[in-house]
Amino acid sequence: VGHYHAEPGVISYSGIPEFEFNLRLAREVKTHLETNGLQVRMIGERGNLIFLNHRTRAAQGADLFLSIHHDSAREYLLPRREEFAGFSLFISRHNPHAAKSLACASAIGAALRAAGMTPSRYHADPVIGENRPFADELNGVHFYDNLGIGKAAKMPSVLVEAGVIINREEEARMNDPAVRARIADAIARGAKQCLK
């Protein structure tokens, strides 16, 4: 579960902390992964696990580290918030299993697209604080080499930004239980496919 109570991430259009979105989606992903026969270890569910090294240590022995988040945009871009929507997936080339991370991220992105979701493109834009090159443009996967969790994990690692919650319409979609279930199912199907 991305973020924690003391640092809850971005605040959505309607004022809900990102951590709440992350927790709901992570629980749904867990259910779908278990339904697909995979074992899941939830990390950060109580909102008190602060340090990245504690999170990756808690994941020791896992085949894949998924970090569930919801997206925003740089502060100077907030007046254009309604332009930003879609999912993004991030991997680090500094992860010791970068090729497997990319394979898993691509599988998750393909499953999200098959479920009707659209990848966000703005992280690849040449603007301050972004400029994250595509690793797999079709499936919304970006390289983010200095991503803390991506570098720290000792197993393949994918950070999922499920949607842009500063966008009013996208926040409403992320709050829709049917949409959340579709996203969670797609993440689980992609993860299962890459772990075969």
Question: Where are the language model's segments positioned?
Answer:
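Active-site-proximal helix/loop segments of hydrolytic enzymes
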Residues: 13-196
